[in-house]
Every structure is written in structure tokens, then in C-alpha cells.
């Protein structure tokens, strides 16, 4: 569990959007009970989605998962140690680009996929209609992280196997098993569609400043909410509370 949480923290969310917003954008509710006290909360909604290279909050994702559209379940092998991130230099092990190296531009952990810039591409036709033949575009197909790629050792720029180890400072890093060189996680992994790096982000009018977010405004007290209101409004309780018993 700790390793999974660590890797999840390393795999930054490219959307930079609240998780609740993403879940709400892809949610498909077919039926639910009224919000009345005489009804039990029951909801019939879609729970199985087909994940592809389209982001879950986009219209293309919803088009591929239209309501009442049933698709065959895709069996995914769980990856306990997710080790590929945006910006990694990898070597392709299969296909027409076998032996070539490229940079990871997109990570799809739901399918154990990565997209490599300029590799494993093909042509496809889009926008075809009755009176328009459409256009041909170049599209990069995903590669499987368990069978199709491997990391490149930064010391000699050759493909290598690796393992996770701890440094003397307690930091968990990827280490090449051939040379012992640390393979750092690229800074590109912190990139979102809002900024390249967190330090380069320019605050907008509706953004809450970091100083305000980090300010401690909660003062822990033993008094209840009602007691705090009475204290602020100068109300003094002069009644004697009745005795209560625990059984």
C-alpha cells in the first residue's frame, strides 16, 4: 500500500483539476431516488468505462462511452510499481520502431499505456463524410509498459533494466541494474495544462494566493460550535443542566 501511494504521488495529475470535477464530468446517472426523507438513497449509474488516449473530462471520452453503450471488458494486468513518467527517455522493443528511442509524452495508467513522441505511429482518416473524403493525419499509437518499452540509462543512452531503491537520505529512486546510475524522474512529470512548472505559474484574478491557503485560521478548542457563538455574542448560560445517565 505504501509503495502504491508513493507511486501515485509521483504520477502527477496532468489535468490539474479537482478529482470531484473529473468524476462528475464522466458520471452517467440513469436513475436515482428522490432526495426525500421517505426514500432510501439508491442510484443506477454507469460504473464501467472504456479508457483510451482521450482524457476522462473531454467530449471525446464521453462520445466513446455514450449512455447505454456496452463494450467488452478489457482485462488489465495490475502494475504495482508504476515506473514510467512523462519526459522519460525509453527504448521501443517491438514493432517497426524496434530499437529506437523517444520521449514519453502521455501516460495512461488505466490501460498500462504510454505515448512516445514520433514513434509507433500510423496514418488514420478523420472527418470523412459523404461529400468530403476527410483528411489523413499522423497518429501515435500507445505502447504497453510491461512488454513494449524499457528505460534508457542516462550514462550511456542504452536500454536497461532497473529497480527501485532508497538513497541515504531516504528518497526512493530508480536505479539502472547495469551501471548503478540513478534514473531521475523528469521535471516534465510536474507539467499540467495550466503550467510547465509550478514555479512558472502566474496567479490569476480568481486564484487563491498560496499565502492565504497556507495561513492557519483554525484554532482548536474544546468548546462546541454553539458555545463559540454564545461567546462571540456575549450570551451567558445561567441555567443548570439536568442530570443525564448512561446505561
From Swiss-Prot:
Highest taxon, organism lineage: Eukaryota
Domain called KOW: residue spans: 84-117
One annotated Gene Ontology cellular component of this protein: mitochondrial large ribosomal subunit
Chief place where the protein resides: mitochondrion
Oligomer status and interactors: Component of the mitochondrial ribosome large subunit (39S) which comprises a 16S rRNA and about 50 distinct proteins.
Record family assignment: Belongs to the universal ribosomal protein uL24 family.
Name the record gives this protein: Large ribosomal subunit protein uL24m
Organism: Drosophila pseudoobscura pseudoobscura
Amino acid at each position: 500500500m505504501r509503495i502504491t501511494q508513493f507511486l501515485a504521488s509521483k504520477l502527477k495529475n496532468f489535468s490539474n483539476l479537482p478529482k470531484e470535477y473529473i468524476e462528475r464530468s464522466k458520471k452517467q446517472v440513469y436513475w436515482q431516488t428522490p432526495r426525500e426523507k421517505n426514500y432510501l438513497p439508491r442510484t443506477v449509474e454507469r460504473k464501467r468505462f472504456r479508457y483510451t488516449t482521450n482524457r476522462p473530462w473531454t467530449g471525446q471520452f464521453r462520445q466513446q462511452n455514450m449512455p447505454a453503450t456496452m463494450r467488452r471488458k478489457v482485462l488489465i494486468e495490475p502494475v504495482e510499481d508504476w515506473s514510467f513518467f512523462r519526459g522519460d527517455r525509453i527504448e521501443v522493443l517491438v514493432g517497426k520502431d524496434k530499437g529506437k528511442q523517444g520521449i514519453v509524452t502521455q501516460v495512461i495508467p488505466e490501460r498500462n499505456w504510454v505515448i512516445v513522441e514520433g514513434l509507433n505511429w500510423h496514418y488514420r482518416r478523420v472527418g470523412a463524410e459523404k461529400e468530403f473524403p476527410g483528411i489523413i493525419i499522423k497518429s501515435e499509437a500507445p505502447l504497453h509498459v510491461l512488454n513494449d518499452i524499457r528505460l534508457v540509462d542516462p550514462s550511456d543512452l542504452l536500454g536497461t533494466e532497473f529497480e527501485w531503491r532508497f538513497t541515504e537520505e531516504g528518497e526512493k529512486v530508480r536505479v539502472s541494474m547495469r551501471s548503478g546510475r540513478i534514473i531521475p524522474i523528469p521535471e516534465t512529470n510536474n507539467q499540467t495544462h495550466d503550467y510547465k512548472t509550478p514555479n512558472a505559474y502566474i496567479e490569476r484574478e480568481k486564484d487563491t494566493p498560496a499565502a492565504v491557503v497556507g495561513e492557519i485560521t483554525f484554532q482548536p478548542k474544546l468548546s462546541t460550535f454553539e458555545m463559540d457563538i454564545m461567546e462571540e455574542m456575549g450570551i451567558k448560560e445561567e441555567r443548570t443542566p439536568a442530570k443525564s445517565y448512561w446505561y
